UniProtKB/Swiss-Prot annotation:
The keyword Kinase applies. It is found in: Cytoplasm. The keyword Membrane does not apply. Keywords: Cytoplasm, Kinase, Transferase. This is Hydroxylysine kinase. Its EC number is 2.7.1.81. The active site is at 228 (proton acceptor). Catalyzes the GTP-dependent phosphorylation of 5-hydroxy-L-lysine. InterPro entries: Aminoglycoside_PTrfase (IPR002575), Kinase-like_dom_sf (IPR011009), Pseudomonas-type_ThrB (IPR050249). Belongs to the aminoglycoside phosphotransferase family. One of its GO terms (cellular component) is cytoplasm. SUPFAM superfamilies: Protein kinase-like (PK-like). It is an enzyme of class 2 (transferase).
Amino acid sequence: MAENKHIAALNNNKPALSEDQAVQLIESLYGVKVLNIKPLPSYDDQNFYIKSCSEDPNGCCEYVMKITNSEDSRYGELLEAQTSVMVFLCSNGVPAQKPVFTKNGQSLSLETIDYGSTIQKQAVRLLTYLPGTPLARVVATPEILFDIGKMAANIDKMLAENFLHPNKTCFERGQFIWNLSNTSLLRKYAHAVKETELQKIIEDVITQYETFVLPNLNCFRKCINHGDLNDHNILVEKTSSPGSIQEQYKVSGILDFSDMSFGYYIFELAITIMYMMIESNDPLHAGGYVLAGFQSVIPLTDEEKDALFFLVNCRFSQSLVMARYSVQLCPENEEYLMITAKTGWKHLQTLHDMGKEAVEKIWFETADSYVATH
């Protein structure tokens, strides 16, 4: 698999279908008559919201069309395995999207697409549309953060214990830049960060990973990670009654399984904490609520607890460094690429300055307090 998922978007491999091209593909591959189409954001692929003129046999009339970049489209077995995970999770009560099959009964179709200046082979999938509000648009309460931590743990646990697939080894993705095992690869891209102080923090994070985490990887419990539970990939719906003092939500959808890879339970927790900190008004305590939810399903071992602080810093560093690098090569996508950077550098600097002991104290005491009062 490509080492850096952004590189595909930066080497003219990112899909760029017009809406007319997308409509033609949908109608020819799936027999879906399109009533409305609109683009959806994507890092290195292309997504469209589709509304059809009539319901399918399952009562569905809303879809998401996903066109995968030409680099990742070379790995059809991985894309098919990701789709199988979605089907598996749906059957086990997780609100994930379901694939819509082509007229030929396939879950994806590799299409040769003519862009005029170039011809590319890109995988096309149609998935059911999940209604809901992205978590990024609501104020995350302790309750929803707990539920998200619990959901993250449940997903990994289900996949580790019960997911069977002939191409499961596809999730061993080697040098995949977004796997926390590959934190050291960030040095190749750190030159994109120009500020000396920030460069030093990134190098400190990588060195701490290599010193305190890497030697202990074999102590962690292995699983398949979703790997990208950010606040745009989690949908929620309101559960509170009109007039309630505080709005309450429940998780109504989990999106985007393209970063799945073999990792460890503690990786999923660190990734989820990092993303839940990004938009929070109380980022340090937010980590504690996620931790409480995760541990309600998968209690951490001492070795895993000891690595958590370092791994959260690693994920901040991955996201921030790769965003800077990607913007240099793809400036027209800056607004989307830099979502994390708006508050991410501040949060990473805070964690770095406070240090492991002080941050862990807040996380674990917050988790214990939440459990004791709920």
